[in-house]
Structure formats: structure tokens, C-alpha cells
């Protein structure tokens, strides 16, 4: 599916889930996904909405699908569609609870889908999502797609659910060695691959300072561009859109071995942010 073509209905309102650039209530966000240079199908999907999605004031998602010729594409797209539907219909109001329960719900749906259709057998997807509310960021992740906080420096907030990350934590591998390790693509958690709690997401809550940024991305970016260069590109770029496009171009220039997805968010607060949100 072309990167700019997919439209979804957000609680009765249409929104695009591949490339978006909005400025609403001092939250700027731009996202883009690219097939890369070595793949013929883009199995990544992204979702960007600075508008409310159900009880959530905004929502940003990167999903990196896997499994079979078409199944990875289906898994990432359906995961986002199902999560948005869940967010639109749940009666819960706490962002962390919505992220946690929503991911567990879509895990079962995708698992059942994979087991009822031979073409989708073995499919699954990573999932990293973020919601900004009242100066806090609520984050959930399953797999090795990441969220970075860019303030005074760049900081990886999420922890990869991967074999090499476990090896780094056990002291068996250096962090830089993990980037090029032959098992770097082996993940230990994914949505849709099992019915049990192996898809339970990590949930984080952090504060975000005025003007700081968040980056959600798939491993197609981080395997090709080191954190230092990601930080440098974001700081030197004239806009968040320019930064995202440069990040993707750099990943392709460095080999483009996988699909590449990135969402960059900038939060700028005003005194009347809550009242502005209620007027929309």
C-alpha cells in the first residue's frame, strides 16, 4: 500500500495514518514511512493524530510487521486500526490504562486472525505508541521499535524486546556490538505471535519540557543511523518535517536494508492548553 494513501476513520472522523503534519494546541507532529532500498513491500505502518482519539488527547504509533509475503503488512496495519477502534470505544480515561489494555486486546485479535488464515500464519508486529497529556508522555512498547526523548541530549526511553538487548543487559555483548550482531533482528516480544501475556507491553510515564521532542521509529532507522547522528540531524533541521525526511534519507544512504519509519513530535505549551483542547 502506498505510504501516503491509507485513510482511517477516527471515531467518526477521517484521518491519515501514514504521513501527517498538524499543529494543534502547540503540539507539532510529522510522520513518514519508507520501503527502503532492499525490500519490495513496506511492512511498517504509522499513525499520527494530534487530534483526540476517543478519550486520548492525541495518539502516535509506529508498528513494524513481520511474517510471510503479505502478513507483516497486514499485521502492522490491522494492529493500528484495531487499537484506534479500541481507543475510540473504551470507557477508560487514563492513557496508561488505555495503552496497556488496548495492546492486550489487539494481540488476541491478531493472534486469532493469524490462526484462522493460512496466508497470515506466523504474522506479528512490533508496536510503540505515545500519548501526550498535561505535560506528561505515556508510552507503551512491544518489540524493538523505539521512542527517544530529545531534550538536552538524546535518550532512549523504551527497552528493546530483543535477544541482543538481553545479551547487553547480561553483560555478554557491548551496546555497539548489538547494532551489527547477526541476531539483532531476533525479537523476544511481538503482538500477535502468542495468545498469552508474552505481548504485555512495557509502560512508561515521563515529563516533557517545553520545546523538547519525541521520536518514535522502527529499527529500519536505528539499524542504519546511530543515536548520535539522529540527535544531530534533528537539532540541525529547520523543521520537524525536514528532520524526518533527512533521517529517512540518511538511513537509505547508509544502506536502507529495511523499511524505515519515523514520527517526530515537538511539544510547546501554553497557559491555556487545557481550555484550547476542550474547544476543538
Indicate where each model-derived feature is located.
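PP2C/PPM-type serine/threonine phosphatase catalytic domain
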Residues: 2-280
Amino acid at each position: 500500500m502506498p505510504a501516503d494513501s491509507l485513510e482511517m476513520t477516527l471515531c467518526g472522523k477521517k484521518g491519515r495514518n501514514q504521513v501527517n503534519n498538524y499543529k494543534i494546541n502547540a503540539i507539532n507532529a510529522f510522520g513518514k514511512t519508507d520501503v527502503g532500498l532492499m525490500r519490495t513491500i513496506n511492512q511498517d505502518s504509522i499513525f499520527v493524530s494530534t487530534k483526540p482519539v476517543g478519550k486520548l488527547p492525541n495518539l502516535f504509533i509506529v508498528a513494524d510487521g513481520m511474517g510471510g509475503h503479505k502478513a507483516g503488512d497486514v499485521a502492522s496495519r490491522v494492529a493500528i486500526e484495531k487499537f484506534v477502534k479500541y481507543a475510540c470505544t473504551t470507557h477508560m480515561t487514563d492513557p496508561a490504562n488505555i495503552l496497556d489494555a488496548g495492546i492486550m486486546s489487539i494481540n488476541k485479535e491478531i493472534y486469532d486472525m493469524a490462526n484462522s488464515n493460512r496466508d497470515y500464519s506466523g504474522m506479528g508486529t512490533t508496536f510503540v505508541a505515545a500519548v501526550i497529556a498535561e505535560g506528561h508522555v505515556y508510552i507503551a512498547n512491544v518489540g524493538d521499535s523505539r521512542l527517544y526523548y530529545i531534550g538536552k541530549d538524546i535518550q532512549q526511553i523504551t527497552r528493546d524486546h530483543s535477544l541482543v538487548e538481553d545479551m547487553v543487559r547480561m553483560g555478554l555483548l557491548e551496546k555497539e556490538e548489538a547494532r551489527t550482531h547477526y541476531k539483532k533482528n531476533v525479537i523476544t516480544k511481538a503482538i500477535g505471535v502468542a495468545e498469552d501475556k508474552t505481548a504485555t507491553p512495557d509502560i512508561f510515564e515521563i515529563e516533557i519540557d517545553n520545546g523538547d521532542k519525541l521520536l518514535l521509529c522502527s529499527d529500519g532507522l536505528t539499524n542504519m543511523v546511530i543515536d548520535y547522528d539522529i540527535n544531530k540531524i534533528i537539532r540541525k533541521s529547520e523543521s520537524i518535517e525536514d528532520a524526518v525526511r533527512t533521517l529517512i534519507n540518511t538511513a537509505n544512504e547508509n544502506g536502507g536494508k529495511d523499511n524505515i519509519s519515523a514520527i517526530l513530535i515537538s511539544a510547546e505549551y501554553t497557559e491555556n492548553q487545557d481550555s484550547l483542547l476542550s474547544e476543538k
